[in-house]
Amino acid sequence: MSQAINIRQLHVVVDAPAEAVFDFVSDLRNLPAWAVHFCKGIRLVADGAIVTAPSGEMYFGTTGDRDLGVLDWWAGPTMEKAQRWPTRIVPVGNRSLYTVTMIFGEHVPPAVEQHLSEELANLKRLVEAREGATAAA
């Protein structure tokens, strides 16, 4: 069994407070709107969701601490076998730096960085639009 580990890290700067980013990402009902390559469908369950991904159905959930900006993603065939991808939300003035660390074994899926980069751009657009609508109200 290989002990290979491959780490990839991506980030996005969002023109919104860290709390707004945390709230948006931790609400799994928002996942299909921004994670368009990963989430083709979603069914909410206790402590997470069953996501229809390109590879089939899988568990997806989050754990975190809003005040600390810690929001970890958990994904796998079941909740018990889910693996963690740590994400962090750091306030930068009135903006937020959202960083996702992807952890793979020997195999890194093709185009995963491109896909997640596009998804983070979607997340940025949606959070900023929501914050703009909130500020205008």
Regions found by a protein language model. Name each.
Residues D15-E19, T63-L68, I89-L97, R125:
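A short, structured loop/turn motif at beta-sheet edges
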Residues A20-V25, L31, T62, Y98-V100, ...:
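Hydrophobic pocket/interface hotspot
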Residues R43-I50, R66-W74:
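Short, hydrophobic/aromatic-rich segments at coil-to-beta transitions
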